C-alpha cells in the first residue's frame, strides 16, 4: 500500500515559482489538494505564510490561497457578468459585508485590470462570463485568483484543457502576473516544455514522494529529451511540447 505524501517535507520560499511533474497517480494533485484544504492530512502540518492551516477548511484558507483549476469553467460564476465575478474576487479574504453596486471608480479599476489581459474583455464587462471562450474564462480566473495577491498561487494544469493558442496566451499571462506580483507559485503540469521553460524550480513526484528536485540552474541545462528520459517508468501520459 502506498501512503500518499508519507514523510514528505517541502518548503517553497517566498517568490519561488515551483513546477511539479509526475505520472498519473504520482501524488501531484494530492499535494496541491492538501495545500488547498480539499482534505485534512492524517499527520504532519501545512504552514502557509507562517500560519498553520492544517485543520482549516478550504474556505478559511481562501484568504491565503489563489487557485486556478484545469477546467476553465471552474472558479467562476457563469451567469454573473465579468464585472460581478471580479467584484467577488476583490472581496476574497475581507470581512463579510453586504454586496453593493459597483462604483464608477471601482468599475474603472476593474476595466484597467482586465485590459491588462490583452483580450479586449474590458469592453465586455457586462457580459455573462459563461458566454466567453475557455481561454478568456481561464485568463479571467487567473486574474481573479491573483486580484489580491495570495500567499501562494496553485495552478492545477491550468492550460491543459485549452487550444494551443489560448494555452500559450494564458501561460504568458501567468508568467507576467507571477513575476510582476512576485507570487509564490506551485504549478502542476504534464507538459515537459512548460516544465523546463516556466518557473525557477522543478519537482518530479513518484508514488507519493519527491523523486527529483532541481534548482533553476540545473533544470535550465536539461533538454526535453533528457527530462523525458528521467521521466521514463512513469505510469502516466506525457506531453512533450513539440
Indicate residue ranges for each PLM-predicted region.
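The feature captures the beta-strand-to-loop junction immediately N-terminal to the Walker
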Residues: 21-23
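Helix-to-loop junction immediately C-terminal to a conserved catalytic motif
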Residues: 36
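Conserved ABC transporter NBD signature motif
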Residues: 44-51, 212-214
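ABC ATPase NBD coupling module
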Residues: 52-66, 74, 96-103, 220-225
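A short, proline-enriched helix->beta-strand linker immediately N-terminal to the Walker B motif
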Residues: 147-151
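Catalytic Walker B motif of ABC-type/P-loop ATPase nucleotide-binding domains
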Residues: 153-156
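H-loop/switch region of ABC-family ATPase nucleotide-binding domains
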Residues: 189-190
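Conserved beta-strand-loop-alpha-helix hinge in the C-terminal portion
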Residues: 209-233
Amino acid at each position: 500500500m502506498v501512503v500518499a505524501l508519507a514523510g514528505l517535507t517541502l518548503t517553497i520560499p517566498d517568490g519561488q515559482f515551483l513546477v511539479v511533474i509526475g505520472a498519473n497517480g504520482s501524488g501531484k494533485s494530492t499535494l496541491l489538494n492538501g495545500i488547498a484544504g480539499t482534505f485534512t492530512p492524517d499527520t504532519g502540518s501545512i504552514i502557509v505564510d507562517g500560519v498553520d492551516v492544517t485543520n482549516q477548511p478550504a474556505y478559511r484558507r481562501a484568504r491565503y490561497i489563489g487557485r486556478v483549476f484545469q477546467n476553465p469553467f471552474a472558479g467562476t460564476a457563469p451567469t454573473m457578468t465579468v464585472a460581478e465575478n471580479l467584484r467577488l474576487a476583490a472581496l476574497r479574504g475581507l470581512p463579510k459585508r453586504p454586496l453593493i453596486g459597483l462604483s464608477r471608480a471601482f468599475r474603472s479599476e476593474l476595466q484597467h485590470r482586465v485590459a491588462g489581459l490583452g483580450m479586449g474583455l474590458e469592453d465586455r464587462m457586462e457580459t455573462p462570463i459563461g458566454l466567453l471562450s475557455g481561454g478568456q474564462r481561464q485568463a479571467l480566473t487567473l486574474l481573479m485568483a491573483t486580484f489580491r495577491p495570495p500567499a501562494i498561487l496553485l495552478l492545477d494544469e491550468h492550460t491543459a484543457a485549452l487550444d494551443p493558442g489560448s494555452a500559450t496566451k494564458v501561460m504568458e499571462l501567468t508568467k507576467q502576473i507571477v513575476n510582476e506580483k512576485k507570487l509564490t507559485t506551485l504549478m502542476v503540469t504534464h507538459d515537459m516544455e512548460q516544465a523546463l521553460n516556466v518557473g525557477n524550480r522543478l519537482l518530479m513526484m513518484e508514488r507519493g514522494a519527491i523523486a527529483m528536485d532541481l534548482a533553476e540552474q540545473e533544470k535550465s541545462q536539461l533538454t526535453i529529451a533528457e527530462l523525458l528520459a528521467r521521466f521514463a517508468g512513469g505510469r502516466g501520459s506525457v506531453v512533450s511540447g513539440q
